[in-house]
């Protein structure tokens, strides 16, 4: 992902690999570890965007990548909101959120009331085998005033049986 992480008006690079999430500071590309080893299994995705208007991006992360386990949320999938410290070059505090198995992709979505929701897309529906079974539960997470408190979710869709990616787009002119 590309975003300004420190309000210096320069685009920084944010990367997620199996064990680490880090940002690389423009223009020296100095690496700053945000979090390490959120779960037993690999990190799989990040959503990066300035959602509070302070010029510095916020981050959510998906982890516990285990696409073969489609039922047990303790063995497959994890969603985290990462709370930044005052000094963003230091480690961030992960807040684990409720989730569906096979967490796969996520994006920040600007709602019509100009607030941001985190939309999370699993790879498979619960108990799904060979693209048969329950549909993928795409959820929108609503940020509470204190992100350490429980996040409410809204079901966006549950009709697909396997999904690999998504993006946010404005398809019409209604601004919503």
Predicted regions and their residues:
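Beta-propeller-forming repeat regions
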Residues: 1-176
């Amino acid at each position: 992902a590309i975003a300004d992480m420190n309000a210096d008006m320069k685009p920084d690079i944010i990367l997620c690999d199996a064990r680490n999430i880090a940002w690389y500071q423009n223009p020296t590309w100095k690496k700053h570890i945000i979090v390490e080893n959120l779960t037993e299994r690999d990190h799989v995705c990040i959503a990066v965007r300035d959602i509070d208007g302070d010029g510095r991006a916020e981050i959510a992360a998906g982890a516990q990548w285990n696409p073969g386990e489609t039922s047990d949320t303790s063995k497959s999938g994890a969603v985290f909101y990462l709370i930044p410290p005052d000094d963003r070059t230091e480690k961030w505090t992960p807040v684990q959120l409720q989730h569906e198995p096979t967490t796969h992709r996520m994006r920040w979505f600007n709602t019509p009331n100009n607030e941001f929701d985190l939309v999370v897309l699993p790879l498979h529906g619960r108990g799904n085998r060979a693209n048969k079974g329950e549909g993928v539960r795409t959820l929108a997470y609503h940020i509470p005033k204190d992100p350490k408190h429980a996040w409410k979710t809204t079901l966006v869709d549950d009709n697909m049986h396997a999904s690999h990616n998504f993006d946010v787009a404005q398809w019409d002119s209604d601004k919503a």
